Amino acid sequence: MKKLSLFLIIISIISCKTVEVNQQRQQTTKTVVELGVIGKITKGIEINTFQTTTVPVYKQKIRVSADILAFDDNTFNTYAQAALQQNKKIKITYIDSVANKPGYANLQILDKVQVLDELNAPHNTGVNTYLQNATNNVLITGLSAYFDAIELSNISQAEEVYLINNKPKKYSLELVKSGKPFAIVDISKSVPFTYTTASFCWKKERGKISIANLTYKSETCARETYKNVAKLNKKINYYKY
């Protein structure tokens, strides 16, 4: 009986830290999380906390997928806790028995190659150097957030969505329709309540260290690439012996 109770407690704690969004388990957050930033996750008993450590410069816009999803009980409760903690005064009327439920946006970075190019570019040398010397940093690759009705409507009409760095250390969404931008959405005005992350895999070519790839969840780095930069400098050349 004690083992069963302990098991149920563990399952309850895990379920509080994640919630299913679009058939994907995502980390829950009560604090503000921004798409495209880099930071560290501090594990807690009830919830993990993400803290931003560095904000990369994206000179090129990054393609993003944007799905408008309807709240269910789990996602709405997660949102409500986040809105309270973030002191965001955005009111939503949610009734479980009503078929037409309010929606939110699920954003995911699509263009991983563009992100890698940007992180390895000269304008992000400081970010790159920091990441080489600081462990356990992750990139925010996706988030679920509530935007006001007008912005949600604009996002739903967009044929293409891009993450843009239109102000210093500030990201927005550029919405495109018929090949032309028609709206800019300020992400900071939303209420994020879940997020996804990716870790960095590093390589060394001709003496230069750079980010080779981004890995998700339990994925491992490809051959000759490592999550720990120190391993690149500890490789032994056995041909010397």
Task: Outline where the language-model segments fall.
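Bacterial N-terminal signal peptides
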Residues: 5-13
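Residue-level marker of positions within ordered structural domains that often coincide
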Residues: 6, 21, 178-180
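Short aromatic-glycine motifs in intrinsically disordered, low-complexity regions
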Residues: 160-162
